[in-house]
């Protein structure tokens, strides 16, 4: 009996862990890319070259446009991967991304990923007071919110701080639909009253 429970628990744990791994790997890739961009800017300064933002009606410094594209491609891939990830974004501290935009946010929902589009998540005064932002910023660590309901769906938000020279430059957020975990295996004919809860 114990082996059956262990096997079921391991199988379900792997399902949940795979979602967390996709989120963490994507956040780590974005963190590293942004950190490299900061290093390049510190070493080379501003080149004077600009490109139009995919989201805002502004010209971004070329390196920041490359960061924006990297964020988008990774978010589109992660959100449309068929996992429980329903949204992903990057929210910066004021003036921490590009001088052309004080409050720079970029977010990809499931519908955005399907259309290869994105959206703003509002101004700094709106997102900087949210627990997913403040806790990651203040602790300089990965945080997970308590479950909450958004448009009738139970969610958690995982947040990773963007650090450069030990200064928080922003936060990467990943929204996870915990209702997707209801597909966890809890069927065993030997144990008809068995259920799984995450």
How would you describe each model-predicted region?
Residues 64-74:
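Well-ordered, non-membrane alpha-helical segments in soluble/globular domains
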Residues 153-187:
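Conserved beta-strands of PAS-like sensory domains
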Residues 1-65:
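Juxtamembrane extracytoplasmic/periplasmic/luminal helical "stalk" adjacent to the first N-terminal
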Residues 17, 125-130, 159, 175:
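Amphipathic alpha-helical bundle/coiled-coil segments
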């Amino acid at each position: 009996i114990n082996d059956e429970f262990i096997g079921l628990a391991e199988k379900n744990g792997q399902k949940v862990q795979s979602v967390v791994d996709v989120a963490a790997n994507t956040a780590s890739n974005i963190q590293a890319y942004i950190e490299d961009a900061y290093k390049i800017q510190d070493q080379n300064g501003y080149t004077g070259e600009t490109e139009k933002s995919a989201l805002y009606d502004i010209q971004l410094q070329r390196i920041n446009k490359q960061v924006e594209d990297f964020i988008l491609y990774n978010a589109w891939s992660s959100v449309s991967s068929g996992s429980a990830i329903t949204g992903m974004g990057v929210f910066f501290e004021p003036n921490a991304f590009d001088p052309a935009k004080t409050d720079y946010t970029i977010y990809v929902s499931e519908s955005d990923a399907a259309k290869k589009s994105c959206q703003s998540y509002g101004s700094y005064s709106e997102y900087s007071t949210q627990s997913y932002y403040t806790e990651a910023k203040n602790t300089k660590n990965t945080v997970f919110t308590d479950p909450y309901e958004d448009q009738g769906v139970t969610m958690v938000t995982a947040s990773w701080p963007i650090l450069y020279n030990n200064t928080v430059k922003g936060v990467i957020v990943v929204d996870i639909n915990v209702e997707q975990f209801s597909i966890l295996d809890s069927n065993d004919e030997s144990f008809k009253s068995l259920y799984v809860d995450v």
